[in-house]
Amino acid sequence: VHLTDAEKAAVTGLWGKVKVDEYGGEALGRLLVVYPWTQRFFEHFGDLSNADAIMHNPKVLAHGKKVLSSFGDGLNHLDNLKGTFAQLSELHCDKLHVDPENFRLLGNVLVVVLARHFHEEFTPDVQAAFQKVVTGVANALAHKYH
């Protein structure tokens, strides 16, 4: 992902304020609600019967935190996202058989969650920078599929 110095500063500056444990569960929960076909990968998480059940499901919240923590780790390696996410790409491709489109969807949902929490700070320029990053992460996670 090619980011200008200003974009890197915007992304890392805002990320320092992200409540990973809270926003991760919200992002994954929203993915499962908005795109219900993604639930098939999480059937072992228990009750996913409606939005309220999903958004309060402890396994969804815990996995969302894990996903967002991994995303945050990627921000430390913006120049090598493919290498950073190589093992996760292999896992999701070879073992879990996740449709790589889901990575793009989750990235877009994450942008929505950030906009929801950061209002005025989440300017169009900040959104554009984050959109580059989530696209780069999605591409890195889909790399094994190519």
Swiss-Prot record:
Q: Which organism is it from?
A: Procavia capensis habessinica (Abyssinian hyrax)
Positions of post-translational Phosphothreonine modification: 12
Q: What is this protein called?
A: Hemoglobin subunit beta
Classification via Pfam families = Globin
UniProt-annotated binding residues for heme b: 63, 92
The answer to keyword Heme applying to this record is yes
Entry keyword annotation includes Lyase = no
- Function description: Involved in oxygen transport from the lung to the various peripheral tissues.
